């Protein structure tokens, strides 16, 4: 109630529960988005033991679809079954499968399924009839699809000169990527592929809501590449940070996911929009930071900001027993490490109804300082003319212990920690 009172366009009402007085909202500041996923999974396991909850008693709510990626990966690592409510898992989304198909061809040009997926994406004028001719020519010559498009004249592919030029441009592009497999890490080569194939231009050319969701997914995918490389470097395994290694890790994660696709006791992951009308004993509302929640698109409109506030109200009221909110001090966004500001909405919740927790689930307060981390830089994959703000690269910072101290100020001045 204290939150929604900040909306001017509302019919005043006081919401109450017929259940016994519940727990306060629990705010858990974390160092990074990676730690956010780890902490949420840890709390799920703790509450299972403490309250004898089933996995289906938990929901993780986020503002945008792209935020699911890091939670999916952590749950797969910790063997916590989950389902994406009202959508599909991160690596099954079309735009992600398209990029992965490029990666697969770069690592293995003989992957015919992948090459047929990308040969005309983004559109380059190589249509279905040409693809059928390539397949027929490959069968006739007992050669691979890749061999035919690399040497179409040699193998007698019957297409016109315009199509031959298009095939040559495609194979030259892919060969330029293949040449970098051993010299670039997964992030460097991945960004190069997304940019030079012009996937980024295709994805960022529209501003409709579905297109924005695809853009956020691609940006989160790049964050995942960056996170993968950084993790390998921190482990002293830089030599295993190549594109081949990244694909192996994704394959392992998606194999685990496909082995557990039956309905049953699973944690629900969903956007807040998808959560309307549902309730769960325990809810985690993640990404409580400015430019995530509220969305950056709401900053110029009082009406849209009120809608964001209503969404948080909806999210909080999905919880029957426990409601956790998390905010990260650092988060990979748009291929760069950004320093987060806790959401202004946290300042609007009556402090009497919110507790701040550290790594100890019960009550231990934040107490130890964050120590610096080696610098690590990244670049944006948005086409230059489409970037909303030009932000210089930011160096990341390490933390020696996951139970850390941080004093964070929200947009409206709330101090956390």
Task: List PLM regions with ranges.
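Helicase P-loop NTPase motor core
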Residues: 1-81, 104-108, 164, 178-181, ...
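Short, flexible loop/turn segments with low-complexity composition
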Residues: 13-16, 237-238, 359-367
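Short strand-loop junctions, especially beta-strand C-caps/beta-turns
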Residues: 30, 58, 87, 328-330
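Structured loop/turn residues at secondary-structure junctions
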Residues: 32, 63, 87-88, 272-275
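Conserved GTPase G-domain signal focused on the G5
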Residues: 36-37, 128-129, 358
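Conserved helicase C-terminal RecA-like lobe
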Residues: 54, 68-80, 93, 100-355
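Conserved helicase motor
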Residues: 64-65, 84-94
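Acidic, low-complexity intrinsically disordered tails
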Residues: 349-417
């Amino acid at each position: 109630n204290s939150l929604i009172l900040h909306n001017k366009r509302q019919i005043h009402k006081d919401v109450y529960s017929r259940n016994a007085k519940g727990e306060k909202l629990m705010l858990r500041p974390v160092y990074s988005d990676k730690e956010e996923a780890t902490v949420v999974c840890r709390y799920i396991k703790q509450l299972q033991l403490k309250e004898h909850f089933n996995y289906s008693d938990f929901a993780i709510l986020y503002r945008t679809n792209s935020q699911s990626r890091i939670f999916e990966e952590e749950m797969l690592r910790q063997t916590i079954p989950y389902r994406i409510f009202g959508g599909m898992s991160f690596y099954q989304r079309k735009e992600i499968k398209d990029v992965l198909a490029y990666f697969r061809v770069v690592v293995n040009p003989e992957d015919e399924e992948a090459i047929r997926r990308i040969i005309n994406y983004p559109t380059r004028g190589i249509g279905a009839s040409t693809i059928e001719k390539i397949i027929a020519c490959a069968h006739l010559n007992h050669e691979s699809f890749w061999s035919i498009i690399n040497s179409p004249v040699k193998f007698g592919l019957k297409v016109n000169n315009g199509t031959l030029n298009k095939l040559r441009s495609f194979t030259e592009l892919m060969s330029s990527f293949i040449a970098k497999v051993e010299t670039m890490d997964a992030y460097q080569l991945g960004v190069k592929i997304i940019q030079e194939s012009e996937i980024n231009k295709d994805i960022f050319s529209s501003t409709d809501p579905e297109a924005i969701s695809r853009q956020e997914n691609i940006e989160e995918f790049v964050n995942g590449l960056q996170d993968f490389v950084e993790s390998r470097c921190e482990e002293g395994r830089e030599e295993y940070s190549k594109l081949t290694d990244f694909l192996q890790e994704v394959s392992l994660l998606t194999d685990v996911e496909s082995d557990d696709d039956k309905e049953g006791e699973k944690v629900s992951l969903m956007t807040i929009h998808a959560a309307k009308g549902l309730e769960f004993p325990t809810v985690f509302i993640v990404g409580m930071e400015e430019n995530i929640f509220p969305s950056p698109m709401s900053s110029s409109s009082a009406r849209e900001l009120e809608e964001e506030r209503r969404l948080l109200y909806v999210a909080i009221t999905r919880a029957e027993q426990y409601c956790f909110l998390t905010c990260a001090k650092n988060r990979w966004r748009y291929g760069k490490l950004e320093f987060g500001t806790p959401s202004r909405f946290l300042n609007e919740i009556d402090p009497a109804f919110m507790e701040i927790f550290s790594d100890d689930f019960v009550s231990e307060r934040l107490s130890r300082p964050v120590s610096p981390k080696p610098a690590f830089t990244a670049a944006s994959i948005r086409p230059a003319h489409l970037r909303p703000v030009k932000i210089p690269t930011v160096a990341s910072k390490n933390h020696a212990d996951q139970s850390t101290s941080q004093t964070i100020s929200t947009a409206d001045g709330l101090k956390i920690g």
